[in-house]
């Protein structure tokens, strides 16, 4: 089961917060798990590349206060999103909310009251709550040759320089890096593997930018800063993919196109790129007018 949960909260007292709060939501999520099963929280905190969850930054109506701070008045509703891509982890998180372990969470030095947790919805029309399965994502994937995505929080890819071996952050929605990010997370967590090399070769040969409108943004995590991009990007598969219409696409290309559509939908749950557990890379596919697409 894949789940996207939105947790609605308000500060018990007036709160002063930093502009970047993904790491606070990350800490709050681990604390929620810790109250149910300390070992689960401990294992998630260990450094491994494909953790089965993401968090969003805190969302709400904030006012600037001083240099680099945000003011939230007591009682102001805010929300944050967790996506969970593992059945055992989902069961642990559900116990916290269903068994009433606590109605309070701490974000930094501030205490927030939980008012509700939304689990229903289909992720459409701006709704960030949804649930599905890996099987359903793949079975329901379309054969659209156009993909439109929006990157809501700063997104970056950690790439290695082939000459020096050094890693650096890449802040552009290169489709190959996007699909590499999604396919690696898929194969790490899904019971239905995708041939990553074949898919990425397909993407590299056939995908092009239709248009993009992005900006760079900085996330300040306190001890360090991270640059990323936000905005919209449209991709299109071209050449042999579109020639002759969908009825004449060869079987292998059809399979890859279906997988590409599935992964674009999967991005809603897995995020994109680097530090998705700290609020970066929040991504969702956008509806293309006149296609009936999601």
Question: At which residue positions do the language-model features occur?
Answer:
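RNA-interacting cores
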Residues: 1-294
